[in-house]
Amino acid sequence: MTNIRKSHPLLKIINNSFIDLPTPSSISSWWNFGSLLGICLTIQILTGLFLAMHYTSDTMTAFSSVTHICRDVNYGWMLRYLHANGASMFFICLYLHIGRGLYYGSYMYKETWNIGVILLFAVMATAFMGYVLPWGQMSFWGATVITNLLSAIPYIGTDLVQWIWGGFSVDKATLTRFFAFHFLLPFIIVALVMIHLLFLHETGSNNPTGIPSNMDMIPFHPYHTIKDTLGLLIMITVLLALVLFTPDLLGDPDNYMPANPFNTPPHIKPEWYFLFAYAILRSIPNKLGGVLALAMSILVLLAIPFLHTSNQRSMMFRPISQCLFWLLVANLLTLTWIGGQPVEHPYIIIGQVASVXYFLIIIVLMPLICLVDKYLLKW
């Protein structure tokens, strides 16, 4: 008699995706982040669903409803901080997942990589709209500044901004539609994740060496499920430590003040996970140029498979490329720091140098160093 998980039409799909999936035996803990992202998404959808039961998307009551959740709802404070800090954990895992893809050449699976970049855009859009919902000072001014960037688009810019706002400023209509989209997008993300996995399972997983490992496969369960469980325990420990001890560590104190259109905060900045892109945006004095650079800072990921000039897929055996990769990481950390600083000397010039270096490393230096590595290996 055949095992039901191998014969049942629905269970067979789950079995082939998560249980009997042939997986390279050499993949390291850097491959844990895919499953961690799935768990983060589940946590966000569940906590978000319960928060939505108590939240009201009206400018007069949004701030009060969030206060009500924290004070009057059973474990409402925990739901709220799990959701807010869960977003931070989501982005930490996301950036590490992308970093692993860059380091080990996973971008050579072009379809999987491209869907991943679309997923990144969808998650960033969801997080931005979620940040607006508590209707604090930083929520309101963040929404005003970021949506206003679209006015840089020639000819249709102003009309486009007013269409998104649903009026002549960020107001009730904006908050209502942002809540609707913030609720809807995670389910679109789930669909995209399924497509992402579909393309991944067409080719199979990459491995640290970048060499095909068809001869050395092991079943996903129990070997990698046990390994992923360790990553999960570490992530849950960090998340609970954040939620229970320092829930506001990554937030902005200004967001505890109700939104006031007549009072601009001294320093408008997004959540920490957008600071690198915000720094690139601010580094260019021209508005349209800044918006284009902001978009390109993420879109450049789509070009990476075409900029790969090496004979070797992974950076494991390319020491010069490794140095450049860690330089890029340091550069991104510098941009994140600059994004949180006021617009004054010396932060302006540091931001401009780091922004130029970001694009220079990805578009020019990486392909050149790949060619140098290729030449040295021949030599």
Curated annotation (Swiss-Prot):
The keyword Translocase does not apply. One of its GO terms (cellular component) is respiratory chain complex III. It is a multi-pass membrane protein. Its main location: mitochondrion. Heme b b562 binds at H83, H182. Its cofactor is heme b. The cytochrome bc1 complex contains 11 subunits: 3 respiratory subunits (MT-CYB, CYC1 and UQCRFS1), 2 core proteins (UQCRC1 and UQCRC2) and 6 low-molecular weight proteins (UQCRH/QCR6, UQCRB/QCR7, UQCRQ/QCR8, UQCR10/QCR9, UQCR11/QCR10 and a cleavage product of UQCRFS1). This cytochrome bc1 complex then forms a dimer. Component of the ubiquinol-cytochrome c reductase complex (complex III or cytochrome b-c1 complex) that is part of the mitochondrial respiratory chain. The b-c1 complex mediates electron transfer from ubiquinol to cytochrome c. Contributes to the generation of a proton gradient across the mitochondrial membrane that is then used for ATP synthesis. PANTHER family: CYTOCHROME B. This is Cytochrome b. The lineage of its organism: Eukaryota, Metazoa, Chordata, Craniata, Vertebrata.
